[in-house]
Structures are given as structure tokens and as C-alpha cells.
Design a protein with these regions (language model features):
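Eukaryotic scaffold repeat domains enriched in small/polar residues
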Residues: 1-290
């Protein structure tokens, strides 16, 4: 989800996950701990009153850190198919948090009251052990192709961590305060040597069911609905399919957009604006759901 204004003079935004940098007994940096949730908050811009709407589950990243002869080895373990939550703010000012575990919606209404609506029917796909292993193998193959196309990718990641641990600028979305930093444009003196590698969780750590949606799946239209871009559980021709969910938590429509189109925005009365790339030109198209 993204931050949004609405008519009651409130600003809704997503906070940052808790991040704790640990130190070993020897005084060297240890593996940081990153929370797997982050808050969604609502602030009244007139009264400055802030409410925590709830917490959304985000992808869990496990970071390992070891030190050998002055060289730090960083391992970043990620889950390529995480079960997460999504959120959006409707045109009526209601905040919807869509839960990935069972696909239901927790609401904070515009007047501040809260409610939860029923689970949304979904054709859940069970992931067999073979499915999980094939997915991890496929993701690794994609990573290998990307690394071959950009040989300096891992080196750039390692340099970013070297800067952090030597007192320079941190990588995006990482905040740490450590001694030894200095100003100026060059790398800090005494910057440690860091090797950073991205790995993936074991297939057995993947969910037994394919998630209903990925991150950034939620969009609010101009008619009070939340559009959820779902993950297909069966081969489907055409573009992505969206569940259109009303304020009662009911799917009132399922909309498939054409291939190579992306939703750019909405208009009242079921109007959808789609963007389409044609070479170097981006075209905006107007369509109706009905």
C-alpha cells in the first residue's frame, strides 16, 4: 500500500519495520534482527492525533553475519513466495488491511470504528514438495541469469555493506549508527572488507499453499472498492486478474485487464485508466469494467 489523503483531513501511511543491530561480545557487529511486521498509522492533520490502524506482515529477511580475519561475510536469506498482508485506503476513507494468511479484510472505517469481514473465497493451490523445490530452482536460475548480465551486482551489494560497517551511507531501507564514520566524498578510512551474498530459504520453509497475492497488490478505485491483483492458481490466458472487494468485504466483480497493461488510476462509475508501453512511448487508455 501507499500513503493516501482522504476527506476527513487524515493522512494514512506505512511505518518502518523495527530494526535492531546487534553487537557480538567481541565488540564486532553481529547479525541484525529485522521484524516481519510494520505498522500502518493514521494521523489527523488538524488535531495531530495519531492512531495505529494495525500491523501488516511483510517479507521476512534473515541476515547472517560472520567475521573471519577481518573480513565480514553477510548472507541475506529471502523467501521468494512470502505470505504477506496488503493495505489500501478507499475513496470513502476506510482503511482496508487484507490478510494474506486466510484472505480476509480488517477495516478501520472513516469514523474510527473497526470491523473484520469474512474470508474471501479463493481457489487455494496446495504446494507439494516438488512444487516448492521447482520454485526455488527457478528463482535461483533467474538470479544466475541476472548476475551473468550484471557481473558487478554482488560487488555493489558488498560495497554498500562495507560503507555501512565502516561508517558510510547505509543501503536503502537500512538504518544503523556505528562509529568510525567521517564526512567527505570518498570511502571512510579503515572500511572493512565485506562479502554479501543473497540466498533463498529451504523449500520446506515455503508455505504449504501458494499465496493469494504479492506485495503492492492492493489498489483503491473511485467507487469505494479495493482491487486485489491475485496470483493465478491455474494457467490463464490474458493479463492479471483482480478481485474487486467492496466495503462489506465481498467480491463484487473479477476483472481481467489486457496483456501488457498496467492500472494507472480510476474514475467514478467503473472507469479504469490503463498504461501501455509501445516502444519508448507510454499510452494511456480509458476503459470501463461494465
Amino acid at each position: 500500500g501507499v500513503g493516501a489523503f482522504y476527506s476527513n483531513n487524515h493522512l494514512v501511511y506505512r511505518g518502518m519495520p523495527a530494526f535492531q543491530m546487534r553487537m557480538n561480545a567481541s565488540g564486532t557487529p553481529g547479525a541484525p534482527a529485522v521484524a516481519d511486521t510494520m505498522p500502518v498509522v493514521r494521523v489527523n492533520l488538524a488535531t495531530r492525533v495519531l492512531d495505529t490502524v494495525g500491523f501488516v506482515k511483510i517479507p521476512k529477511t534473515n541476515i547472517g553475519l560472520s567475521n573471519s580475519d577481518g573480513k565480514f561475510n553477510v548472507t541475506i536469506e529471502v523467501n521468494p513466495l512470502p505470505v504477506i498482508d496488503e493495505w489500501s485506503v478507499t475513496s470513502e476513507g476506510h482503511i482496508a488491511i487484507v490478510r494474506g494468511k486466510d484472505y480476509h479484510v480488517d477495516w478501520m472505517l472513516a469514523d474510527g470504528t473497526r470491523k473484520s469481514t469474512a474470508k474471501i473465497p479463493f481457489d487455494w493451490k496446495r504446494m507439494t514438495d516438488d512444487d516448492k523445490a521447482a520454485l526455488i530452482d527457478s528463482v535461483k536460475a533467474v538470479r544466475d541469469r541476472m548476475e551473468a548480465a550484471n557481473p558487478g551486482q554482488n560487488n555493489q551489494l558488498s560495497q554498500a555493506y562495507s560503507a555501512v560497517m565502516g561508517g558510510g551511507s547505509p543501503p536503502p531501507n537500512m538504518m544503523m549508527m556505528m562509529g568510525g564514520g567521517g564526512g567527505g566524498g570518498g570511502a571512510p578510512r579503515g572500511m572493512p572488507q565485506v562479502s554479501a551474498v543473497v540466498t533463498y530459504v529451504s523449500p520446506s520453509d515455503l508455505s504449504d499453499f501458494q499465496p493469494a497475492f504479492f506485495a503492492t497488490a492492493a489498489r483503491a478505485d473511485a467507487d469505494g472498492n479495493v482491487w486485489m491483483r491475485t496470483i493465478n492458481t491455474k494457467p490463464t490466458a490474458g493479463g492479471p486478474v483482480y478481485d474487486v472487494i467492496n466495503a462489506s468485504g465481498e467480491v463484487v466483480d473479477r476483472v481481467q485487464i489486457p496483456l501488457e497493461r498496467t492500472i494507472a488510476g480510476f474514475g467514478a462509475g467503473g472507469v479504469v485508466f490503463l498504461s501501455h508501453m509501445e516502444g519508448t512511448v507510454t499510452r494511456l487508455e480509458r476503459a470501463r469494467t461494465k
